[in-house]
Amino acid sequence: PILYNRTKEKRYLDFAKYIVGQWETPGGPQLISKAIADVPVANRFPHPKTWFSRENGQKAYEMMSCYEGLLELYKVTGNPLYLSVVEKTVGHIVREEINVAGSGSAFECWYGGKERQTQPTYHTMETCVTFTWMQLCNRLLQMTGNSLYADYMETAIYNALMASLKADASQIAKYSPLEGWRHEGEEQCGMHINCCNANGPRAFAMIPQFAYQVQDDCVRVNFYAPSEAELVLPGKKPVRLKQTTDYPRTDQIEIEVDPAKETAFTIALRIPAWSKIAVVSVNGQPQD
């Protein structure tokens, strides 16, 4: 529905609905009904005879991209089924596929990787999968405000994504396995790059957009790292935030809040799900 949002031409919205409707036909992928039936993501399609083919439905990047499109359609139609299906699928991915480094896949496919992460596998944690997983979680975070999605992104950023980057930042690996060595991947389309060379930078560029988000009169601080941000609240009210921290090496985070003029708004600080004790202070005074 992105073209519909830009043009307001109904034919684009109708086409988006048609695509989703075709999912549930006998020959379609049934991405909605399989999610409702709690089919594991690695089992939502039969294993193809040829890996690199249109029949390969386990491809993680492509499957998540379909669910991203469903979220965009939800934003236009408000159909609660669409959001529910995506949240259920993300739950399956977390329980079945995401490893200790915050990403997943082998040969770019879902494969029940969470319980197999201590076993030798090949071409694991494709950077395109890491990027798309972060993007899907970020969209759900923006829509629901559920900080668990930010937790998933943080784990992926500090582990799988950082592991894909060469020490001098000159190259992004296509695969970053939990053992062995990084694999930079093959050249594609007659160019000196591949898909992960393109999507890796998109993942890094997503971090500042994810770190601070504004919704209504609320500023959400989702990611803790030394940074400065200039944000605009509704009514064109600018506010500047400066974050000083050595997190995650240490557990102290200091945030300076500097609105252009006195105004009332909320600051929502992410408390990671793994944190057993969290203390928030304002001007040195602990808050309840």
What residues fall within each predicted segment?
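Glycan-recognition and catalytic cores of secretory/periplasmic carbohydrate-active enzymes
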Residues: 1-288
